[in-house]
Amino acid sequence: MIEPSEDSFETMMELKNPSSKQMESSEGSSNTVEETPGSSGAQAGAQAGAQAEAQAETQVEAQAEAQAEAQVEAQVEAQAGSDSGPAQEEKEPPSGPLKEMQELPTNLLQEVEEPSSGPHQEMQELPTDLLQEVEEPSSGPHQEMQELPTDLLREVEEPSSGPYQEMQELPTDLLREVEEPSSGPYQEMQELPTDLLREVEEPSSGPYQEMQELPTDLLREVEEPSSGPYQEMQELPTDLLREVEEPSSDPCEASSNDLPQDMEESSDDGSNQESSDGSNHELSNGSNHESSFGSNPESSDVSNLESSGGSNQESSDGSQKESSYDSNPELSDNSNQELSDNSNQESSDSSNQSSDISNQEGSEPLSEASDYSMDETINSSETQSDQDDTDLGDDEEEEEEEGGEEEGQPKNSPEEVVATMGNVISLFLRMQDLKEQQRVAERLMMQAINEGRLPSLRPFSGDRRDYHEFVVLCQMTMQNYPSMLYNDELRVKFVIRHLTDLALEWANDLVEQNSPVINNFSAFLEAMSEKFEYRQTLRVAEDAMFNIRQGNRCAADYINEFRGLIPTLGWPDEVLQAHLCQGLNEEIRHYLFRIPQPNSLDNLIVLVLQLEEKLAERRALLRLPPESRPRSVAWMDAPAPEKWRVSSWLPNEFHPDIDRDHLFLLLLVRVDPYHSVAVRALVDSGAEGNYMDERFAQEHYVELYEKPYPQIIQGVDGIPIGNEPVWLCTEPLVCVHQKHYEYIEFDILPSPNFSIVLGMKWLRTHAPEVDWMRGRCTFHSPYCLRNCFTPPPPCIALETYSISLLPGLPHTYSDLADVFNPREADDETSDQPSSDGSDDLSESEPSELQQAGDSDQSGVFYESGARETLEPVSARMQEKARQQEKAREQEEYWILYDMLTDRQDYTQMVPELFDQLHGAAWFTKLELLGIKESEMRHTVTHTEDTWRASFGFGLHQMRCYRPFTMNSYSDEGNNIVHFILKDILGLFVICHGREVLVYSMSQEEHSQHVRQVLVRFRYHNIYCSLDKTQFHRQTAEILGFNISPKGVKLNKNLMNLIVGCPVPGSRRCLQSVIDLVYPYRHFVENFAVIAAPLVRQLLSSEPYYWGEEEQEALESLKRAFRKSPVLYHPKPQNPFYLETDITGSFLSASLVQTDDETGKKSTCAFYSRPLSTMEVEYPRVEMRILPIRAAFMVWCRYLENTEEPIMILLNTEDLASLNNDRLTVLLPGHWVFFFSHFNFGVMEMPAEGDTQALFRRCWNQRGFRARFLRPLLLMSIRANLRYFDRSSETEDKEDDEEEEEEDGEEEEGEEEEDGEEEEGEEEEDGEEEEEEEEDDEEEEGEEEEDGEEEEGEEEEDGEEEEGEEEEDGEEEEGEEEGEEEEEGEEEEEEEEDEEEEEEEEEEEEEEEEEEEEEEEEEEEEEEDEEEEDEEEEDEEVPSMVRELLAAIPMDHILNGLLAHFSVAQIRAVVLNFFRGLLYWKSLLGVAAVLVMLRARQPLSPVPAPNLEVARPQHRHTLRLILDSTLIASSGMATAIAQLLSQMPPLVGANTLPARELAELFLGPRCWHRNALHSQPPRGMRFTPGFWLTLCEFFGVRVNPEDDVFPDPYQHRYLELHVVGDEDVVLREALQDDLQRYRQCGLHDGLQDTSQDAQDNDVQEDLFGDQEAVTFRPRNLLDPEVLDFLNNRLLYTLGTDGRLTLLSRDQVAQALTRFLAMASRMALPSPAREQARLEELSDSDDELD
């Protein structure tokens, strides 16, 4: 329904009661209602008088009568002439006859900027040049417009709704009171009575009447009007509408012209192009600033008016255009206030109708209510620019097609969610600005009411503190004089006339630039707001930045929150670095300041994350004994000076000498053109000038100047401060605080507590706004806006743009060019100043760098400085090496023999060798000249000794690795370089022969490390090859290893050497092959198993023979090396996993962790060896524990005293055996003490295709979230570096694949097939790695739509579940088959008849054949599963955006939003939320409710009196212990507890006390008691077996009280606690408990018998000796229960005739249906008092 114009109603009320005019005007102004032209929203000023009304009353009445008659006649004619309602205005009726507009002359229409709001028939015949100038429609009648002269119309920019001639005749004092008239004639509306005005909502004539009668849903479905002007409007060319500045008032005109013919049939009648394109420009250009006050009667007012969803009327011109902003949160305050005074129910319906129509098109289906106009609002400038260059019809068509596609896929991508969330937050904060503006308006209005007039409009100088008051007064003034300020240009000129100083300069610049905002008042206000308004968004961001601290959080969470504030603040990089460091923990800052300061914020973030990782590793390593700790820990703990230019950074604790009530600023003082110092500056209003501490100036080499005359320091009161005058000062230094730049000249004085003091001189200059409560200063003065918010020109460091004398040499080392060019080194090169400001080191006076780099060296050694001194020493060492050559060759065989035959487990070398490389991210490889290249002899001793020497290990550290004789390195060049770099070798340098590798954690630190090495080489006349040197890389190769930040891999050269080994023709050649590959055995899984035939041949005393077995072993070994993975650096702070196995007479183990970036399994090391003769005879249980013990022994450095439990991954069979045998109880006596040093548990090994199983477990562990977010940040910051790594790895893969293809061509027969299989597997590995790279790229933001991702994830989940079910089924079938074989073997031993034996053998053969067939089927299934896994991996697309969404502080956002909602709104939201929870509740919960309500069955009492006599006294009730980790959903535990608490009484047990319930469950006499019933109960018979099955299946166990059923001590079971997963068991037994178990004979009895026999014996003892029942642990189910689960619950018959294992969810659904049927058959019964259930208490004391 269309409402009457509000100003028409007020005008009539003025005629009745003139005195009410002033009251309503003042109310309208205070309510800040905005009005549109013709919609009567603007209120008249409060300054009008009663005399002006009386003078105008008679004249207005006469004119209104004539206009009323003309209006009625025009409406009758229009009604008679209209056929059916064309698509006209829905908001206002036509105000003039339809034929009038057609007769207007062209020259007159060209001057009209606002076309009329009449029907479309008039618009069709308008010429092209008229349409190009159309801006806004006028609402006056066309008949009156024709009578106006042309020269008068040319001056009219926005005519009023009444006739312009009569408005000119009104006196000035009357014009001040005239509100903006409505769309009808002003005279008519004044004379219309109240009852007539009420009927104006639905005019009686014209097509408008028919349109009004259509319902909203019908209007939306109108495809094309049946006749008249609408069809003709479609014929207008599209290019005419491109120049329309403001869309037409008729919504149908604006939309129909833009739509092509085919689009009109499917488009809505009420939607238009302006709702998505045209109107956004006005809102984004500042219409929100005036939205609260109604000063702008144009479309921006309409936008705010309609945005309330029900304010006033919708009959204004152009209102449809702005209705897309009806849900804008910024305007809710204005609309709420508007609703309180000016709205009614009909207007609310009308505005809602228009908003629905306008928002139906060009929006996303998910956000139908209010959210889908926000993106258009934020991106309005882009939309407006696109509209000028694009065909509107095509855009409409594309938008509608996209909308149709999105309806099918309503899910938004994570990027859209993040963008929408950002829009919501920005709009919410923008709404706070409008609230502040509204509060200012209310204050000014109250002041105006008290004083009787508006406050005077003071000029605005640019002070941001006066902005809101100035804008509000301007809008109120323009509201009171609408006829004088009736267009945008006049309003802008009015505002500019009241600007002074900085604000006037800004406006004059816009005028001189001929900016388009001068002609658009909304855009002008927006630009002014951007310049002079201190917005709430910036205020909130600054408060958060000053208060943000890391606290107990991980650095990744802190950095995520910090980075979220950066775009809003826009502070310079150096200021952000200072604030980031200020909020860090003291421990991180301590080590951070010892590293050179990074040159950017991103590098600082990377460095902080690396430091946190190093500190976590350090804390883990400190748990080891001092002799086992790596050297990196000692280096971190060594004292070192701070290298940052940081001063007075107070820690979080209170300083004893500083009063915390002082006001401090974090100030960055640029002490030289290239460096700034962060310092806390004291703001002291008691000091007169600005002062700097004398020590601070000396420490940072600040240039000081002498004053012309000494100056005495005085306070504000004039009292001298100090005894000595000030005679030194600094030059003006650049000081930066946030975005505030200034030049300050400091006076120098001794100030021990404060480095910088800012006094009254600084306060007077900047006039900051000081918040003493929060200790903050903000700068709003015009002086700061003019001078302090523009950064000074940067100082260009010449070293950054310098060109090195040698091409390829980085400029950082340009002063050391002579090290790389020994022949052309001259004086010019040597005299070149160094880049860090230090002098050349060859001069007599050493520089700072030389002192810092060489201070710890021996002075005698460096005094010699000549290489000749070292040559004799090297010659003697070389001679000694020659003498030992023969003896070494003789010993090599015996050393290798000892290593191959040794069966002891020693500490492994390879993982510990690379411990010092942990955290290294930058590498530089130097190639030396003049050094003889060391010849790498591929023997075990020489290779491993070379590794130790290259990494800087000493002889005392070498003894812990191998028991063979140590040999010194024999290379002369090695000894020279090692002697030069001996103190830094292994800290950040690795040296081997000509190759020197420098590695560092950060780029800034790396440059200093390289300089330190180059300085030493220059001092000793050792030169480097520039062509072969690699600077600042992410990967490096040395000693046959490819080193990266993640780990170590064998390089291509070594791989080619191993793969190219020929077939050995003698035992000596075979020894050379084994010498070559044996040192790298830790890179190959099951190395001892693969190389066993070669080792046997080498150690054999028989003649040398090379057969097929040896050839196959050699080829398998080559393939294994080609597939050798990257060995990741072990991280002691992360959880470890052990994979152990026994293969024949060999044991193997692998140390595993999870990759933080991909979540996949990452191997740290492999280990394998043959079993000794004694170990082969170990019992079966000890044999399973043997590889675990070996792994603990080999990797004890990482596994001892770990914080997280070491999870031992076992297969299903071993896991069940070790769980039942009690791993820690069955340990041999000499192993118990050894295992007590380790914190370990056991869990089932995940499926091969499930690469994320370990990652999912780690996600639930404490502290893993921090470890997970840290690499995500590193990925997002260092994308370019990772791209370089991927490119190099891709090249390696391609080379490897080519080599494999060549090898595959050479192989024949089965070997050829094996080679092809391996190649296929490697190709799959390559594809997986490429997929990982693609995943990384997608995590950086280049991912596809979320709909496809989620579909892929659902498919993967389904396939994984099917795969798990099949595997479980196969495992159980395998167990059953194994049991059958054991039974068959026992029968063969017992029976003596040969015939029976033959029959059994035949049966065994048949079984074997069946097993072979089943194995073939299993292999086929495994192949299918592998294919499915490959497809899953192809579809798996991890999203970094989704993971980062978890780090968004939603609690702060939610609290901020809830603070602005009423209690009723919050209550409604909460009720809707819980209604949704109830709707999506688990099906089992619904079934539980049904059982509780309806399954109460009364049972008849037991008639047998003898039971009552024999009944014991009442005891404590039983307790059900719920294990929530075994229940599928989170709410299922509660549902089961309620279900069991209200379950029907057991048949025959309703009169039994709770004491006998346990015996009733498991006792043999329960069926006898059931037979005592005289009559069977009605309904389902819930047998005890059923409830026992239900309890056991859902992890519920019945545990009696201690006093009821005493547990025999000698048969007590070791309690096992389940954590995280059903198959994860942790050990919690003390040493004395283990010894007590052993003393009781439990170990001896269990070790000699099988597990089943042990369990049966224990149960027979329990039931045979006593009537009381001791319950077994949850793992040992009753045989009846197992039979029930196997036959009825867990398996179902599939389509192929095979039994398929059901998942737990399927079983729960089946039980749900069963319980639902049972509840329908059972009758309710009252709950018993004695039998009740209690939930498990959280305390462990009650459980014991």
Swiss-Prot record:
The tissues in which it is expressed are:
Expressed in placenta and in various tissues in late-fetal stage.
Phenotype upon knockout?
Mice suffer from late fetal or neonatal lethality. Mice overexpressing Rtl1 show notable overgrowth and morphological abnormalities of the placenta.
Transmembrane region positions?
1473-1493, 1520-1540
Name where it's found.
Membrane
- Protein origin, superkingdom: Eukaryota
Q: Add the further remark from the entry.
A: Rtl1 is one of at least 11 genes called Mar or Mart related to long terminal repeat retrotransposons. They do not correspond to functional retrotransposons, but rather to neofunctionalized retrotransposons genes. Rtl1 is an imprinted gene located in a cluster of imprinted genes on distal chromosome 12. It is expressed from the paternal chromosome and has an antisense transcript expressed from the maternal chromosome containing 2 microRNAs, mir-136 and mir-127, with full complementarity to Rtl1; mir-136 and mir-127 are processed from an antisense transcript, Rtl1as, and may function as small interfering RNAs to silence Rtl1.
Q: Which UniProt keywords apply?
A: Developmental protein, Membrane, Transmembrane, Transmembrane helix
Presence of keyword Membrane: yes
Q: Tell me, in one coarse class, where this protein mainly resides.
A: membrane
The identity of this protein, by name, is: Retrotransposon-like protein 1
